[in-house]
Structures are given as C-alpha cells and as structure tokens.
C-alpha cells in the first residue's frame, strides 16, 4: 500500500471519505524487499489514486518529482517493473510527461511490456459529472471531462499502459440524452483503436428501489452496455496474442486462458442478445444500437493539457 484516500468527493464512493495518507519511500522499499526476497519479480503499488502521491496543491496537479522518485527508488531494488492499481484520467492528462517518465523507468518501450491500471470514467455527460463526480476532474473543469478521458486514454496507450476503466449505467436522474455522451465516447474509442477494457457497472444505491437492474434498462442504457462489451470483445481479441507470447505461462495454461477468455466473452454477448429481445419486444441489439449510432451529444470542449 503506497497511499490511501483520494479526496475526489464522488457521491457514490466510500473511498473519498478516507483521510489522505502517503507512505514514505523507505517503508515501501522495506516491504517490497521482503516480497522480492521471497521470490516475487515485480512490485505492485496499491493506492486509491496513485497520481496524488505526494500531491502538495489543491488543484490535484500530480507531484512529478515525488512519484518519479518513488518509482526510481523501488526500481533500484531490482524488480522487473513497478505497477499500480489506480490512477485517474485527470491526473494522466494533467502531466503526460509523468506517465512517460514512469514508463521509461520501467523500460516499457524497450521491452514491449504493457501494464494495466484501474481508472474510473463513470459518465462523461457534463450535467451528471457536476452532480456526482465531485472534484474528480481537477485540475480540469467538469465540462472538459469528456475530452480529458479521451486524451488520458491516448496518453496511457502511447506509454504502454492498458486502462481498465469503469462506467456507471442507470443513475436515477440520468436521461437518454445524457447517456448519449458516454455512447459517443465509446464510439470514439473504437475509431481511435483504444486499447483498454471498459466495465459497465449497474448503479447501486443504499436503497434497493433506486438501484438499477438489467430488467430496467432503457434503450439508451442497453446501447451503452452493448457498446462497452463490443469494445471489450475487440480489445480481448487484440490482446490474446500478447497472452500467448507471455513466457510466464506454460502451454497448458495459455490454452486454458485462451479458452476461458473466448468462452466468457461469447457467453456475455449471447446473454445480452437474449436480454435485448426480452426487454424490447423481440428486437435485436443491431436494431436498438442503430438509433444511437449518430452522435446527438454536444462534444466537450477540447482541452489543452497542463504540461508541467
């Protein structure tokens, strides 16, 4: 654990209630060395928002010096790489050079390695961002969030980071036009050959009556769910060769993983086709998705990333 707390203030998340705490490099080196001596060959830093490590300002601009010092200090112990569990797209877009620097410390361009990290998108509809995402978009404005996510995804891919992102479907106060913003983002991801997974999560509330269930999806929400899994199917097919080339796994494990991945994605798409027919009087996903194929949302303003 490298740090805890994020201060983002999202109204659906308990993590933002934690006080922020950064653990010092010497302690992290001590803990990492125990694992390396035990036989592990890499270091994974758990965090609620790694790019806030050492942050010393209220605008949430990443502290590049503190983070690169952390990466270099841990890399000096001899691991193959240092990964992290969580980042934010706003932190990535605010300092592209930081992402380049930690990738360079990991020698990711040199050895071709890709690392995954978790990031929350949740929604890119400006009105929903203002209502629910607190200050998650800092140092950018809430109106810029859609462009921040697109730019952040591009920066991560350019530096061999594989985003595992989440979105939330079925907010109680969400309209179809607001869902369209996120549908358009998924369309843009496909057009730019985005390499990353997007997990669609149904909104869950402390009150059961306000929680979303599959049987309550409207056409726009189903379209977004479908678009996410279309993206995931495309990306999974793209990364299977990477898995097969991975020397960590033996031939039997590679065959097993290939089978699980293919069978799992096939089962999910089959379930969604059946769900579509049940929800919308026998209509197919293609018929539903076609209605939302053309952009109806207002594009978020283009951003100038704050290069520090």
Where are these regions (language model features)?
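Canonical Radical SAM [4Fe-4S] cluster-binding loop centered on the CxxxCxxC motif
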Residues: 1-27
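Conserved SAM/AdoMet-binding glycine-rich loop
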Residues: 33-163, 169-171
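C-terminal, active-site-flanking charged/polar segments
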Residues: 34-35, 145-146, 184-195, 203-205
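Flexible glycine/acidic-rich beta-alpha junction loops that bind and position SAM and/or redox cofactors
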Residues: 8, 44-59, 122-134, 169-177, ...
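Acidic-and-aromatic substrate-binding clefts and catalytic sites of carbohydrate-active enzymes
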Residues: 21, 28, 90-97, 171-177, ...
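Catalytic cores of alpha/beta
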Residues: 98-102, 172-188
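Conserved, mostly hydrophobic/aromatic
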Residues: 28, 119, 186
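Radical SAM enzyme core and accessory elements
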Residues: 227, 231-308
